[in-house]
């Protein structure tokens, strides 16, 4: 069954490719308060807790680890569904001018924009 699925031409290696990942856990991640404030403003996520900062630091270490992977001989994929023909449709507007109707669906708006609560801070009632 698996062999039948993999019989199409593919750029994905059929066997695991060994890769050496650098150990980034020994590199201390230092984030200054200005960077934290900027990230909070851009992401709408409160980073005041130690758990949030630890998650941010581990995410940075993971990104640093995968950024150093050698991809010299890896062909790029255009889609993960490379064995299927993707059907595209013409981009034609069939309905429009419904801004007011859509804005009425939101709990809060400001001018013609939706107002969303920060990611981990409850919206005040």
Curated annotation (Swiss-Prot):
Gene Ontology process terms (BP): glutaminyl-tRNAGln biosynthesis via transamidation; mitochondrial translation; regulation of translational fidelity
Protein localization: Mitochondrion
Keywords from the UniProt entry: ATP-binding, Ligase, Mitochondrion, Nucleotide-binding, Protein biosynthesis
EC numbers on record: 6.3.5.-
Pfam families xrefs: GatC
Note: This protein may be expected to contain an N-terminal transit peptide but none has been predicted.
Family (UniProt): Belongs to the GatC family.
Name of this protein: Glutamyl-tRNA(Gln) amidotransferase subunit C, mitochondrial
Annotated organism of origin: Drosophila mojavensis (Fruit fly)
Lineage: Eukaryota, Metazoa, Ecdysozoa, Arthropoda, Hexapoda
């Amino acid at each position: 069954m698996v062999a039948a699925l993999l019989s199409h031409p593919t750029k994905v290696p059929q066997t695991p490719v060994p890769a050496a990942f650098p150990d980034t856990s020994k590199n201390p991640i230092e984030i200054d308060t200005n960077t934290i404030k900027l990230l909070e403003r851009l992401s709408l996520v409160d980073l005041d807790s130690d758990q949030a900062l630890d998650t941010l630091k581990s995410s940075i270490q993971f990104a640093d680890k995968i950024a150093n992977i050698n991809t010299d001989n890896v062909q790029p994929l255009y889609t993960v569904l490379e064995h299927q023909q993707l059907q595209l449709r013409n981009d034609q507007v069939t309905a429009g001018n419904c801004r007011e109707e859509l804005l009425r669906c939101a709990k809060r708006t400001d001018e013609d924009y939706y107002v969303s609560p920060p990611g981990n801070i409850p919206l005040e009632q």
